[in-house]
C-alpha cells in the first residue's frame, strides 16, 4: 500500500492506459455484438453458427493472440492495437451471447402486444425488445468489462499492460510491494467501473426499480 501511495502519479498514468485498453474493445464489441445478436436471434442456424464461433474465439489463449496478431494485421509487437484487437474479439464473443440471452429474457407476450399495436420488426426490436433487455444486457456487460480489466494485465508480458506492468516489474526486481500495489490498483479500478455500470443500468431501467419496490407491498397484501 505504501508503494501505491508514494507513486500516485504513475498509478494514475497507468490507470488511464489500462482504461483505454479495456474500454475501447468494449465499445467495439458492443457495436458488433448488439446488431449481430438482433440479426441472428430469430435465425436458428445463424444463431448456432454465431455462438459456436464465439465459443471458439474465447478459447484462444490471450497471450498467444497478443503475440500472433502482429503477424496477422501487420502491427509492431509493442503496438497497443494488438491488445485492443484481441480484446475486441473476446468482447464480441462474450457480448453476442449476452445479447442473445438478454433478448430471450424479454417476455413473449410483450412482443405479441407490440405486434398487435402495429410495430414492425425493426421498430419492435429497437423500441420494445432492446430496452426491455437492458437489465440482462448490463449484467453481461459488467462481466465483460471486469474480464477485460483483468486480461489487459496479461499484455504486460509483451510490454503493454497498464497497471499490469507493475506485476512484471515487481517480479523482475523482486519487489512484492510493487506487485501488491498493482493488484490493489487493478482491483479498485474494477470495483469502480463495475459500480458505475450497475448505477447506469439502474438509471436506464427505472421500471425495474419501481417493480422491486412494489413487490414487497403486493406480497404483504396477500
Over which residues does each language-model region extend?
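Transmembrane alpha-helices
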Residues: 23, 122-155, 181, 197
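Short cytoplasmic-facing helical segments at TM-TM junctions of multi-pass membrane proteins
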Residues: 98-137, 163
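Short, membrane-interfacial amphipathic segments enriched in basic
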Residues: 1-9, 39-40, 123-127
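Loop-to-helix entry region at the N-terminal start of transmembrane alpha-helices
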Residues: 10-21, 66-94, 134, 178, ...
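Hydrophobic alpha-helical transmembrane segments of polytopic membrane proteins
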Residues: 163-199
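Cytoplasmic-entry segments and transmembrane alpha-helices of multi-pass inner-membrane transporters
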Residues: 36-69, 87, 97-101
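Transmembrane alpha-helical segments of polytopic membrane transport and secretion proteins
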Residues: 1-2, 9, 13, 195-222
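Transmembrane alpha-helix signature in integral membrane proteins
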Residues: 11-39
Amino acid at each position: 500500500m505504501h508503494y501505491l501511495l508514494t507513486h500516485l502519479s504513475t498509478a494514475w498514468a497507468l490507470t488511464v492506459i489500462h482504461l483505454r485498453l479495456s474500454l475501447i474493445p468494449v465499445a467495439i464489441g458492443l457495436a458488433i455484438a448488439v446488431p449481430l445478436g438482433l440479426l441472428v436471434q430469430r435465425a436458428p442456424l445463424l444463431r448456432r453458427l454465431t455462438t459456436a464461433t464465439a465459443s471458439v474465439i474465447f478459447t484462444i489463449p490471450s497471450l498467444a493472440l497478443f503475440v500472433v496478431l502482429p503477424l496477422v494485421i501487420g502491427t509492431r509487437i509493442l503496438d497497443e492495437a494488438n491488445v485492443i484487437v484481441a480484446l475486441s474479439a473476446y468482447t464480441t464473443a462474450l457480448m453476442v451471447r449476452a445479447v442473445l440471452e438478454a433478448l430471450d429474457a424479454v417476455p413473449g407476450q410483450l412482443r405479441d402486444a407490440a405486434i398487435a399495436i402495429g410495430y414492425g420488426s425493426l421498430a419492435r426490436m429497437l423500441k420494445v425488445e432492446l430496452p426491455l433487455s437492458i437489465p440482462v444486457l448490463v449484467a453481461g456487460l459488467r462481466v465483460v468489462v471486469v474480464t477485460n480489466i483483468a486480461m489487459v494485465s496479461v499484455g504486460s508480458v509483451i510490454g503493454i499492460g497498464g497497471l499490469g506492468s507493475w506485476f512484471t516489474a515487481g517480479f523482475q526486481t523482486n519487489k512484492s510491494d510493487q506487485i501488491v500495489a498493482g493488484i490493489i490498483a487493478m482491483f479498485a479500478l474494477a470495483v469502480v467501473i463495475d459500480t458505475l455500470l450497475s448505477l447506469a443500468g439502474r438509471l436506464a431501467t427505472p421500471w425495474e426499480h419501481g417493480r422491486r419496490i412494489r413487490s414487497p407491498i403486493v406480497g404483504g397484501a396477500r
